[in-house]
């Protein structure tokens, strides 16, 4: 079995021939590894942008939920004065799970365009495109961002493909008001 190999090694120029034949193989391997590095970098960019978008959305939602709470609490205080009774508005709102879910739903639906605009601004500022917003997946606002994938080899095979990344904002108390439910999803398409 190795006799033929020994005979092959004795000829002049065979090592050079093997290198010339192996160079395209090495080039394909290195381009494949380079494409993996590109995917890894694109994923990092998408996650960074999604984190920025989720932080911006959380900051906006803090204001919207606070405004909704103040509206409901002032209405309860006004009803207290009219009925000459006293109901603690804070306890009334926090003790009613249906009312809390309604606050979240109305805060998202009434301000959806502003939230989309804010998330889009921060995600695009960080080099990605926004994809979706999930409200209160695990008590947090989750943003999904995507980056167009441009591989080093087989570019036509990966045309219109994206690398996605997810970012999570901080946990908020009002995020738990939407527990045991499917997260509210807002899409950018």
Regions found by a protein language model. Give the residues of each.
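Alpha-helical assembly-interface signal, strongest on the long, hydrophobic N-terminal helix that forms
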Residues: 2-104
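Short, conserved structural patches
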Residues: 63, 67, 71-189
């Amino acid at each position: 079995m190795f006799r033929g190999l020994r005979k092959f090694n004795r000829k002049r120029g065979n090592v050079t021939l093997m290198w010339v034949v192996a160079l395209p193989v090495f080039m394909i391997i290195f381009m494949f590894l380079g494409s993996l590095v590109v995917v890894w970098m694109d994923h990092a960019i998408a996650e960074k942008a999604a984190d920025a978008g989720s932080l911006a959305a959380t900051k906006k939602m803090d204001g919207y939920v606070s405004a909704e709470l103040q509206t409901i609490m002032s209405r309860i205080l006004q009803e207290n004065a009219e009925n000459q009774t006293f109901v603690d508005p804070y306890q009334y709102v926090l003790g009613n799970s249906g009312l809390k879910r309604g606050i979240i739903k109305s805060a998202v639906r009434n301000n959806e365009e502003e939230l989309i605009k804010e998330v889009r601004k921060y995600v695009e500022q960080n080099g990605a495109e926004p994809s979706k917003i999930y409200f209160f997946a695990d008590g947090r606002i989750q943003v999904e961002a995507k980056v167009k994938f441009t591989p080093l080899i087989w570019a036509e095979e990966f045309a219109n493909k994206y690398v996605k990344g997810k970012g999570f904002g901080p946990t908020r108390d009002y995020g738990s008001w939407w527990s045991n439910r499917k997260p509210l999803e807002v899409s950018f398409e």
